[in-house]
């Protein structure tokens, strides 16, 4: 099958043998596509190598043969954002999450849009945490895993003053009592859930609980295997960077 003049974001690229790259691309029309880019080394291939870097938006032509498509041509459409520090790790995170969750050869246009919006947010220099929570919400919605952010699992309106535990299947379950500090760490305020549903920035003190709760839901859909980017972000936090 010929994939011609397709747009896609490069999620990951790694060396294969001496002169080639294995590249994962998130496309509009074909979902996540694995590309084999042969002969990318040498001075004449510098532009091609630059185009096949994570976060880069490219247009490419490839021939699908089995699991991998043979890359025939690729060029950068724009300039990928130059990210540093935590923003760079956040870029690694959004790419890794879709590398794990986006289905192969199954178009989910919403995921392409999610990635484009998150990439633009990182490039803008805006606050990272809120942009990442929006990204996670939209990815879950795009994959059909989203949940009601206005009502709890019993169908009752979410109370901004209450606390909830996010269940990957049932959504927000109201917590009636918190006996231990750990119980509180594993819950999120109703106010934060309502804000997420209404696309409003939650209160600063509610953001850590929202992050932990969303991570728990994502971990379920990742079959219990965490992300390397999570480990890197946690190590950065421990070092006080």
UniProtKB/Swiss-Prot annotation:
Keywords: DNA damage, DNA recombination, DNA repair
GO biological process: DNA recombination; double-strand break repair
Keyword field contains Glycoprotein: no
Cellular-component GO terms for this entry: bacterial nucleoid
Pfam families on file: RecO_C, RecO_N
Record Gene3D superfamilies: Nucleic acid-binding proteins (2.40.50.140), Recombination protein O, C-terminal domain (1.20.1440.120)
Cited InterPro entries: ARFGAP/RecO (IPR037278), DNA_rep/recomb_RecO_N (IPR022572), NA-bd_OB-fold (IPR012340), RecO (IPR003717), RecO_C (IPR042242)
Listed SUPFAM superfamilies: ArfGap/RecO-like zinc finger, Nucleic acid-binding proteins
UniProt function note: Involved in DNA repair and RecF pathway recombination.
Family assignment from sequence similarity: Belongs to the RecO family.
Protein's name according to its UniProt entry: DNA repair protein RecO
Source organism of this protein record: Xanthomonas campestris pv. campestris (strain ATCC 33913 / DSM 3586 / NCPPB 528 / LMG 568 / P 25)
Taxonomic path: Bacteria, Pseudomonadati, Pseudomonadota, Gammaproteobacteria, Lysobacterales
Gene: recO
